[in-house]
């Protein structure tokens, strides 16, 4: 068996309109992040072409919007200790009711985002633009 070494990773933080994205792992295969969202902020309504992600709420309360399969948005309350898997193609948005802290694990498709506000007749909430 080949002898492999572990490597230290230096986390880095990106400031977003909604809070902070702290990268704690970044490899060609996966990303690990801590997301800190400010109360009253939301990410964009979006889906990913290739990115497969799971997020876990450590603290705070959030609303998760998702397409219910009929073209309508469903809103679900997310509480600490709950986790959601977002497969590629699933329309979703997270809105922080309180200050929230999430753990996110995903594939390494960082710039993979298609914004969907217009498709659902909603105003653009700002945030990151479509990359695909």
Question: Across the structure, where does each feature detected by a protein language model lie?
Answer:
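Double-stranded beta-helix
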Residues: 5-10, 14-15, 72, 95-132
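A short glycine-rich, His/Asp/Glu-containing loop-to-beta-strand
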Residues: 10-46, 51
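Well-ordered beta-strand positions in beta-sheet-rich domains
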Residues: 34, 75-77, 91, 99
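Glycine- and acidic-residue-biased ligand/ion/polar-headgroup-sensing regions
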Residues: 50-67
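Short acidic-glycine-tyrosine-enriched beta hairpin
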Residues: 68-89
């Amino acid at each position: 068996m080949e002898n492999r070494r572990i490597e230290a990773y230096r986390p880095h933080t990106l400031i977003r309109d909604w809070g902070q994205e702290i990268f704690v792992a970044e490899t060609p295969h996966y990303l690990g992040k801590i997301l800190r969202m400010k109360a009253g902020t939301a990410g964009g309504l979006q889906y990913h072409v290739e990115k497969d992600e799971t997020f876990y709420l450590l603290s705070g309360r959030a609303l998760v919007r998702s397409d219910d399969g009929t073209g309508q948005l469903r809103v679900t309350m997310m509480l600490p200790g709950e986790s959601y898997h977002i497969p590629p193609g699933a329309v979703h948005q997270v809105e922080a009711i309180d200050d929230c802290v999430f753990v996110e694990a995903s594939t390494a498709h960082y710039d993979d985002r298609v914004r969907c506000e217009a498709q659902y007749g909603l105003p653009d909430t700002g945030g990151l633009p479509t990359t695909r």
